Amino acid sequence: MAAKIRKGDKVIVLNGRDKGRTGEVFEVRPTENKALVRGVNLVKRHQKQTQAQEGGIISKEAAIHLSNIAIVGKDGKPTRVGFKIQADGKKVRIAKRSGAEIDG
């Protein structure tokens, strides 16, 4: 099955602690059905000191389940994703809310 959410997409969080926040997907984990979104779902991690970096408590993004995020449409609202096959046989993603192509 083709991926409905891909790296580089602007998404909004639908459920959870960060509900309503938006960010850009920078990693998708299809086997886990999860994604990492920049600046969303931050958790504190204890990092051991190494020669390269300093130790301490750092904030980093935790994975969010794909069912809890949705792509932001051109109108700024969350939209579902569908697929459409163009005349030349290319499969493209479309926004169900507006019918506009997400990627061309």
UniProtKB/Swiss-Prot annotation:
One of its GO terms (cellular component) is ribosome. One of its GO terms (molecular function) is rRNA binding. GO terms for biological process: translation. Keywords: Ribonucleoprotein, Ribosomal protein, RNA-binding, rRNA-binding. It comes from the Bacteria. The keyword Magnesium does not apply. InterPro entries: KOW, Rib_uL2_dom2, Ribosomal_uL24, Ribosomal_uL24_CS, Ribosomal_uL24_KOW, Translation_prot_SH3-like_sf. Part of the 50S ribosomal subunit. HAMAP family: Ribosomal_uL24_B. This is Large ribosomal subunit protein uL24. It comes from Rhodopseudomonas palustris (strain BisB18). The gene is rplX.
